[in-house]
């Protein structure tokens, strides 16, 4: 808990800054050494953080939300001695660099504009037991779905248009929305055509907005297709002409009947940007790529704790007026589209004047023999350290 709190109060994943922000009345080196030892030798920290995050955030997920799942990357090209480092594609520059794959799932409420991070996992193709990226994606989806009561729509970019993934989704009856990658033939009207061939021939009978609240409308069409491997399992394709060179082609397992449902699917796909923005927030807001640790366990634990810290901010995004006020960054009174940078700045400002945070009870326990108090529940739905802020 204290490491997560240190991440929030320091705004970084650097262990020296985390230790400094905890303000323990002992040498900084001792605090940093204790945190470093805990992160390096206890690989169960990442699993525990994931479970806590899912237990707190999963009950907030409803049928109307979307779950954006997106493979990302952690660039470690400047740290060649990092343990189990592999080769990944840098999403910012497009280069192949040394680093680790990231996998994140974010719940997005399209109507209210709220974002809830569910899980972020650091992976490595060089780790023991690695099978494939497809297996990693399915494992994360299964872990998240295990904590959910609802069956929301999973949204993934064109990297998810893979035969093994479609096989698992269809056989497990998942609600998914995937952007077609134009690398396969679909069964369509007694023919076999690629996604772009269908897009050129399909009449676009409907009109709707690309994003919720926009007035400008674009033409789109809806048709039924199937995979060659599963000809009896219908899928629905939505083709959108939005001014770019190639039409946007979306395929879903969820039935699409009429203009309104088609428009809602378009909104759902374009709102998956929240997952990409989440990666950017983890890298910039918490300075993930500036971490100097080399052990894979340490990096894995820090990524999981950063995701937990983001989830804690998310639990206050609708009632975090005091945190936003502390940030003093918003020139407009309108609610920010992605409020977590401001919430993080407000959190740092809120505790910047504190002398000590967690240490006093340790001193009382040593002198009086008292037992340690239970750790406070920092999430907004339970009375805890920040419950009075609500």
Give short role names for the model-derived ranges.
Residues 1-12, 21-24, 31, 50, ...:
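Single, function-defining residue in the core of a domain
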Residues 4-5, 32-112, 223-225:
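Active-site-proximal, Lys/Arg-enriched surface segment
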């Amino acid at each position: 808990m204290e490491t997560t709190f240190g991440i929030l109060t320091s705004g970084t994943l650097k262990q020296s800054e985390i230790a400094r922000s905890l303000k323990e009345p002992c040498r900084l080196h001792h605090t940093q050494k204790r945190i470093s030892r805990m992160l390096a030798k206890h690989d169960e920290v990442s699993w525990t953080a994931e479970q806590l995050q899912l237990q707190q955030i999963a009950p907030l997920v409803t049928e109307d939300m979307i779950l954006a799942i997106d493979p990302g990357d952690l660039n470690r090209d400047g740290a060649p001695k990092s343990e189990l480092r592999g080769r990944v594609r840098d999403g910012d520059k497009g280069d192949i660099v040394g680093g680790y794959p990231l996998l994140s799932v974010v719940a997005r409420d399209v109507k209210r504009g709220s974002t809830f991070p569910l899980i972020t996992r650091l992976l490595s193709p060089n780790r023991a037991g690695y099978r494939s990226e497809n297996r990693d994606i399915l494992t994360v989806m299964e872990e998240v779905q295990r904590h959910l009561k609802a069956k929301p729509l999973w949204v993934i970019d064109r990297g998810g248009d893979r035969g093994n993934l479609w096989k698992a989704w269809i056989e497990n009856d998942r609600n998914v929305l995937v952007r077609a990658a134009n690398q396969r033939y679909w069964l369509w009207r007694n023919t076999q055509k690629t996604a772009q061939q269908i897009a050129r021939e399909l009449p676009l009978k409907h009109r709707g907005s690309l994003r919720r609240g926009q007035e400008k409308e674009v033409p789109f069409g809806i048709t039924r297709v199937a995979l060659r491997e599963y000809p009896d399992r219908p899928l629905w394709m939505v083709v959108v002409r939005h001014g770019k060179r190639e039409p946007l082609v979306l395929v879903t397992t969820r039935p699409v009947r009429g203009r309104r449902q088609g428009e809602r699917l378009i909104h759902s796909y374009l709102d998956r940007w929240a997952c990409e923005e989440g990666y950017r927030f983890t890298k910039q807001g918490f300075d993930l790529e500036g971490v100097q640790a080399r052990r894979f366990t340490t990096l894995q634990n820090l990524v999981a704790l950063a995701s937990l810290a983001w989830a804690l901010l998310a639990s206050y995004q609708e009632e975090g007026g005091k945190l936003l006020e502390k940030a003093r960054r918003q020139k407009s009174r309108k609610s920010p589209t992605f409020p977590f940078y401001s919430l993080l700045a407000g959190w740092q400002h809120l505790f910047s004047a504190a002398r000590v945070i967690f240490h006093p009870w340790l001193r009382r326990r040593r002198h009086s023999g008292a037992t340690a108090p239970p750790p406070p529940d920092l999430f907004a739905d339970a009375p805890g350290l920040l419950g009075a802020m609500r």
